């Protein structure tokens, strides 16, 4: 039911999502599912929604489950993550750089979707590679993240 709601175009969609949040905001597992389901949305505005969710008061990169629920799920959203503009790649790279400062192991485990650049058309592949290179060039990057991002460029 939540997936149908998230992917739908009902004029009551936003109110229903807000009501769902209000009802379950104290339940971490359900809230992780709420973030994850929205990150996997097939709607045209999924990338915008995920960016907004990253600023939500209950989203924190300090919680590995929450980070995986939003960032990990979004990075396997074929439509939104691979938007031709590169917006999804930029967003994930930004989040991974921030997450690396808090939890290098979790950040490194979320790199592989960017590393699949060889499977995509030249324009998308170039954007994915550019984000991996930007990650690698980040000052103070952890060893885990550096190794995973470097390996992903090969």
Question: Where in the sequence are the language-model features?
Answer:
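Long, ordered, helix-rich scaffold segments
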Residues: 1-154
